[in-house]
């Protein structure tokens, strides 16, 4: 099996949509997951457009010619650093280095674009994602705490 990481292309749209649905189904397990899912619009059938937009970089990774995960970077102008908005690897391909390879590719792409930092989301309790980012040198810089009021 040969691993690969590459920038996504329009024809990856169907796979990206499937990965997005799988990833979102797992968000509810973690504190804040439901709220994060509500704050990040579902891309759905618009992945083909996202992968060609200059605002985004989307990577896919897998083995041989089978994609098994994705990572999405948002370069929105209102942020002071590009944001890894989503990273997901299918459960049967975890612990094989695909997530690490995509995070490293994301860092390289952000450096190439002249960024001096990169941010990423990791939910409380999601140790796999936190550890993935920490292996690449990303560290926590902000925790947002919430208390629901009334209603």
Language-model regions, residue ranges each:
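Conserved N-terminal entry element of GNAT/NAT acetyltransferase domains
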Residues: 1-14, 29, 151
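Conserved active-site alpha-helix within GNAT-family acetyltransferase domains
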Residues: 100, 124-142
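Conserved beta-strand-loop-alpha-helix junction that forms the acyl-donor binding cleft
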Residues: 91-94, 120-129, 146-148
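Conserved acetyl-CoA pyrophosphate-binding loop and the N-cap/start of the following alpha-helix
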Residues: 93, 97-105
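Conserved beta-strand in the GNAT
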Residues: 60, 66-74, 83, 88
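Conserved GNAT acetyl-CoA-binding A-motif
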Residues: 110-122
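Conserved GNAT-fold acetyl-CoA-binding loop/helix
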Residues: 21-46
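A short helix-loop-beta-strand connector motif used in the catalytic cores of GNAT acetyltransferases and
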Residues: 45-60, 83, 139
């Amino acid at each position: 099996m040969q691993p690969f990481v590459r920038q996504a292309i329009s024809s990856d749209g169907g796979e990206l949509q499937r990965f997005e649905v799988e990833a979102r189904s797992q968000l509810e397990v973690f504190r804040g997951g439901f709220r994060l899912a509500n704050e990040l619009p579902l891309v759905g059938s618009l992945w083909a457009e996202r992968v060609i937009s200059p605002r985004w970089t989307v990577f896919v990774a897998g083995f041989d010619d089978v994609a098994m995960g994705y990572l999405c970077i948002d370069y929105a102008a209102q942020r002071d650093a590009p944001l890894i908005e989503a990273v997901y690897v299918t459960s049967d391909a975890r612990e094989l280095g695909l997530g690490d390879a995509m995070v490293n590719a994301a860092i390289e792409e952000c450096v190439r674009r002249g960024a001096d930092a990169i941010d990423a989301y990791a939910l409380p309790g999601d140790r796999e994602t936190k550890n993935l980012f920490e292996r690449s040198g990303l560290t926590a810089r902000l925790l947002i705490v919430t208390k629901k009021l009334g209603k």
